[in-house]
Regions:
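C-terminal substrate-binding/catalytic lobe of Rossmann-fold NAD(P)-dependent dehydrogenases
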Residues: 758-761, 783
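Alpha-helical transmembrane segments of multi-pass integral membrane proteins
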Residues: 80, 743-758
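Membrane-water interface at loop-to-transmembrane-helix junctions
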Residues: 730-749, 771-777
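Generic alpha-helical transmembrane segments
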Residues: 706, 751-752, 776-790
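Conserved cytosolic headpiece of P-type ATPases
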Residues: 1-725, 735-736, 749, 764, ...
Length: 871
């Protein structure tokens, strides 16, 4: 219904309510049951079972399930009753699925907690009484009261309003609070920004107070309609997910190909079909790193938990990897790069700038505070419209008790500020007389002044003095300060008299940059990341702040929304390469900026807090929503939520993302190298007509214990201290680039050769040589070689140069794996299960010599190849 086009009385009647009494509690309960709660609803949550079974879509997991099924079948057909292999495969697959579900739920709970922190209440009139209720219980027809500082709980038609201003940037992208008036007539079909007689859900009242009737709630509000559109969009696939899927498919196809080859070779050598099939299955088990999905998930989740402690809540685990590849960070100005708190930084008399701590400034601030509605809360905070809050805070800092001053000099009347007048004036009772105090835009207020206060004396205003004041104003404006003029005069009838005023001074204020933002921008530069400011503020203010922070270094790097609108696609595509500040832009411009940068192959992180920012957050590679000042819709659209709304947190998150990617790559490198070693060991033995050196259950133990535990510890490696001193990686680059693929194969060949040598030694070189002894030595050598090799994987530099035991988690995991290996080989029931026998000291000495060989060969290779650092 277009209730904004009706009078307030007609709207209230249409909604079946009463202006003074509101709805009855019974009627409100009835409407709540009919329309539902006043909440924004995201996508329908998947059930626990659905989330669990979704984990089984991974190609690697599917191959493991097939291997498990085949193993069950062969054990059954051979009537062995040995189901240990398939059961262990199933256990690890189920555990991996459980880990995935737990981490996803943990991220969802973090988000829910964030929403609950900002759960609003509403002041409502029901049964003729004013009461405070949860905003979720509001219904259409409720009469609500709003005042400065309130979050508007629902869309509502104003009934009465007094000097009302609302910050609608969350909805419209307009950074300046807009004036609202219950008496404004609005035509049907008007744009939302033109509807001045309504207030909208998720916007903030910055000044004044009003009574209104709720017209829409929940998903029917303006913000709800945008939320509904977002709920229909699917999450994009990240580069990490694509790469892992490719690795999984390659492993699966490779494993099946090798298995088929081994099966045919075995048949040709006269082996029975079932025996050949079991040998092929053992090779499939060796080829696939069963712990890989779980290791990646756990490494991601460990990184996410670490980042959450630094105020970055990750909503989607794979998005962490994308963060590490970011090449552009497009950030809002207000609240993210700046403190989002207007602060007085300059004051001028009629002749010159004056110290902020002097008596003249104290008197100026006190006078201006009398013409402000902002209030000092008594807790060191000031609530109200930002400009007025800055003036009151300055007065308090200079030693004026503003609340006491207002009681001593009460306001008797006022002429409120309006965008047309650009000034506000109040009548103040000062003892036996009444005075007028006015504040506003300097070029407007000076026209109302016939006198000037100079050195404590009132003298007539002259054209020369007027020009001097305007020059002072320009000087402050050139420093990107918002300037307010203050004037005072007498009044005779108790009402503000805006004629014949005496000019008192100028007050300059700004939203200062966050202290930590300076260093964060420098870090971006060192890391090859381009920081960009995108704001709805004026170009002059934006450029001044950007220069202070080091974002803007040359002229000609700023574009306004109006300039963007005039550009063709090709011209704009070229402009984004050099532009570092975008001013007076709309959320639609943000989407265009993101798409233009991505078209150049850039990986873009975009911040946003408003509902209209949601499309840009979705369009970006990494959407970063604000936790404090952000709307629920923006948070739902984002990949990451900054709980402190701080630019420096994004930069820390990028560093964390780089470190996590390094750890994932390190863990996968290690796992694949170990598995290639197992494949080559079994494959080579088959080619030479030897029995299988490793049994399926032994391979499973190696993959799940001596592979996976060190891989997890490698995933907990602390990021390189110089991680932000290198350029972003190319997100399109293969996982196996920069010789990584060759290294994996060479490392696998070494480990496989050492294990095969151990098998041959146990099978032929010792007095009690036999196949079982050979398998025992191969089993021990393969496990211990892989444990030793995990230390090589910490860095491409010498492991001794970084401290071989400096990763305590890896040291503990290595010791635990060695202890478990020893337990399996010495405890009789376990030894029988794994088909191993006890080793003599000479045999153990041989295994130990083979086990330390990977470190020796790795150190030799690093010394010859030079010190190449881990990427």
């Amino acid at each position: 219904m277009d209730l904004y086009s009706m009078s307030a009385a007609e709207a209230v009647k249409k909604l079946g309510s009463e202006t003074d009494r509101g709805l009855s509690s019974r009627e409100a309960e009835k409407r709540l049951g009919r329309d539902g709660e006043n909440l924004l609803r995201g996508k329908k949550k998947k059930s626990l079972a659905a989330e669990f079974f979704e984990q089984f879509k991974d190609f690697t997991v599917i191959v493991l399930l097939i291997a498990s099924g085949v193993s069950f079948a062969t054990s059954f057909l051979e009537e062995r009753g040995d189901f240990a292999d398939p059961i262990m495969i199933l256990i690890i697959v189920i555990l991996n699925a459980a880990v995935g579900v737990i981490q996803q739920r943990r991220a969802e709970h973090s988000l829910e907690a964030l929403k609950n922190m900002s759960a609003p209440t509403a002041t409502v009139i029901r049964d003729g009484k004013e009461t405070i209720i949860p905003a979720s219980k509001l219904v259409r027809g409720d009469i609500i009261e709003v005042r400065a500082g309130d979050l508007v709980p629902a869309d509502a038609r104003l009934i009465t309003s007094h000097s009302l201003f609302a910050q609608e940037s969350a909805l419209t992208g307009e950074s300046v609070p807009c004036e609202k008036d219950a008496r404004t007539a609005v035509k049907k079909g008007s744009e939302q920004a033109e509807i001045k007689n309504m207030i909208f859900s998720s916007t903030v009242i910055t000044a004044g107070h009003a009574r209104a009737v709720v017209t829409e709630t929940g998903m029917d509000t303006a913000v709800g309609k945008i939320a509904h559109l977002l709920n229909t969009e699917d999450e994009p696939t990240t580069p990490l997910q694509i790469k892992l899927a490719k690795i999984g498919k390659a492993l699966g196809i490779g494993a099946l190909s090798v298995c088929a080859l081994i099966f045919m070779l075995s048949i040709l050598r006269g082996m029975g079909v079932l025996s050949a099939f079991m040998l092929s299955v053992s090779l499939a088990v060796a080829a696939i790193p069963e712990g890989l999905p779980a290791v990646v998930t756990v490494v991601l989740s460990l990184g996410v938990q670490r980042m959450a402690k630094s105020n970055a809540v990750i909503r989607r685990l794979p998005a962490v990897e994308t963060l590490g590849a970011a090449t552009y960070i497009c950030s809002d100005k207000t609240g993210t790069l700046t403190q989002n708190k207007m602060t007085v930084t300059a004051a001028c008399s009629a002749s010159d700038e004056i110290p902020l701590t002097g008596d003249a400034a104290k008197k100026l601030f006190a006078l201006a505070a009398l013409c402000c509605d902002a209030k000092h809360t008594g807790k060191g905070e000031v609530s109200g419209e930002p400009t007025e809050a800055a003036i009151v805070a300055a007065a308090e800092r200079s030693g004026t008790d503003t609340e006491k001053l207002r009681r001593k000099m009460p306001r008797t009347d006022e002429v409120p500020f309006s965008s047309e007048r650009k000034m506000m004036s109040v009548a103040i009772k000062d003892g036996d007389k009444t005075i007028t105090v006015a504040k506003g835009a300097p070029d407007v207020l000076i026209k109302h002044c016939t006198d000037i206060i100079l050195n404590g004396r009132k003298i007539p205003m002259t054209s020369a003095l007027r020009e001097k004041i305007l020059r002072l104003n320009s000087s402050l404006a050139d420093r990107a300060l918002r300037v307010i003029a203050v004037a005072a005069g007498d009044t005779k009838n108790g009402k503000p008299d805006e004629t014949g005023l005496a000019f008192c001074g100028l007050i300059g204020m700004e939203d200062p940059p966050r202290k930590e933002a300076y260093e964060a921008v420098k870090t971006c530069r060192r890391a090859g990341i381009t920081p960009v400011m995108i704001t709805g503020d004026h170009a002059g203010t934006a450029c001044a702040t950007a220069k202070k922070l080091g974002i803007l270094s040359r002229s000609g790097e700023c574009l306004t929304g109006a300039q963007i609108d005039k550009m063709g696609e090709n011209e704009f595509a070229q402009a984004v390469r050099t532009c570092r500040v975008y001013a007076r832009v709309t959320p639609e411009h943000k989407v265009r900026i993101v798409k233009a940068l991505r078209a150049h192959g850039e990986v873009v992180a975009m911040t946003g807090d408003g509902v209209n920012d949601a499309p840009a957050l979705k369009a970006a590679d990494i959407g970063c929503a604000m936790g404090k000042g952000g709307t629920q819709v923006a948070q739902n659209a984002a990949d990451m939520i900054l709980t402190d709304d701080n630019f420096a947190t994004i930069v820390k998150a990028v560093a964390g993302g780089r470190g996590i990617y390094d750890n994932i790559r390190r863990a996968i490198h290690y796992l694949l190298g170990c598995n290639i070693g197992e494949i080559l060991c079994v494959f080579a033995a088959t080619l030479f007509g030897m029995p299988a050196p490793l049994l399926p259950i032994q391979l499973l133990f190696i993959n799940l214990v001596t592979d996976s535990l060190p891989a997890l510890a490698l995933g907990a490696e602390m990021p390189d201290s110089r991680v932000m001193q290198r350029p972003p990686r190319d997100s399109a680059k293969s996982f196996f680039a920069d010789r990584t693929g060759l290294d994996i194969v060479l490392e696998g060949m070494l480990i496989g050769a050492l294990s095969l040598f151990a098998f041959v030694a146990g099978n032929s070189l010792f007095k009690n040589s036999c196949v079982e002894l050979g398998r025992t030595m191969a089993f021990a050598a393969q496990s211990l070689c892989e444990i030793a090799h995990s230390f090589n994987m910490r860095s491409r530099r010498s492991v001794f140069s970084i401290g071989i035991f400096s990763n305590r988690k890896l040291t503990v995991c290595a010791a635990l794996c060695a202890a478990l290996q020893l337990t399996v080989m010495t405890v009789p029931p376990l030894a029988a299960l794994f088909n191993v026998s006890a080793l003599t000291p000479a045999e153990w000495l041989t295994v130990a010599a083979l086990a330390i060989s990977p470190i020796a060969f790795s150190e030799l290779g690093k010394a010859v190849g030079g010190k190449r650092e881990t990427e």
